[in-house]
């Protein structure tokens, strides 16, 4: 090779290597940008996730406080002597003033004696025993 050609050849090799270096540097820069963008997106996703969790916990805490306040109000009403939501009816003679007064008293009176209750219980026991006697014996005898 001639010296001019050789120098031209060297120059072309140098520029090619420079171009390759420039290309590789540019690809590295682009890759860095892409990685940085991906990392930023990932960080944004993580931040939004933690913000969501934080808002959920705050809402849950507020709801618990509201329920505690409401139950405290109900407890104060029932324990404080105020009237609660339960109404116990109390009848007065005036409530029945428009009813007919010429009615006869009922023929049967309910007594508070336990004799009748014991008789009923005895009759029930007897009927149960009869039913047991009529039933099949499923116990195996050896």
Swiss-Prot record:
Intracellular or extracellular location(s): Nucleus
User: One Pfam family name from the record?
Assistant: NPR1_interact
- Hydrolase among the record's keywords? no
Q: Look up the record and give one Gene Ontology term from the biological process aspect.
A: regulation of systemic acquired resistance
This protein's record includes keyword RNA-binding: no
| Extent of Basic and acidic residues compositional bias | 111-121
Please tell me where this protein is predominantly located: nucleus
* Residue numbers spanned by region Disordered: 63-86, 108-142
User: Quick one: where's region Involved in NPR1/NIM1 interaction?
Assistant: 47-53
Domain of life of the organism encoding this protein: Eukaryota
Sorted alphabetically, the Gene Ontology cellular component annotations on this record are: nucleus
Induction record:
By salicylic acid (SA) and BTH.
The UniProt keywords, alphabetically, are:
Coiled coil, Nucleus
Task: Look up the coiled coil feature and give its residue ranges.
Answer: 110-141
Motif Nuclear localization signal: list the residue ranges.
60-64
Q: How does it assemble?
A: Interacts with NPR1 C-terminal region.
Instruction: Give the similarity note.
Output: Belongs to the NPR1-interactor family.
**Cross-referenced PANTHER family:** PROTEIN NEGATIVE REGULATOR OF RESISTANCE, PROTEIN NIM1-INTERACTING 1
Q: What is this protein called?
A: Protein NIM1-INTERACTING 1
């Amino acid at each position: 090779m001639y010296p001019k050609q050789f120098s031209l050849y060297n120059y072309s090799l140098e520029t090619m290597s420079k171009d390759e270096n420039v290309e590789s540097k540019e690809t590295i820069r682009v890759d860095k940008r892409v990685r940085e963008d991906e990392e930023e997106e990932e960080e944004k996703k993580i931040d939004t996730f933690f913000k969501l969790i934080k808002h959920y916990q705050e809402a849950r805490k507020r709801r618990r406080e509201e329920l505690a306040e409401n139950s405290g109000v109900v407890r104060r009403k029932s324990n404080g002597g105020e009237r609660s939501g339960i109404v116990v009816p109390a009848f007065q003679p005036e409530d029945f003033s428009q009813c007919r007064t010429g009615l006869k008293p009922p023929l049967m009176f309910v007594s508070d004696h336990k004799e009748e209750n014991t008789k009923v219980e005895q009759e029930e026991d007897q009927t149960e025993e009869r039913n047991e006697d009529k039933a099949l014996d499923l116990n195996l005898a050896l």
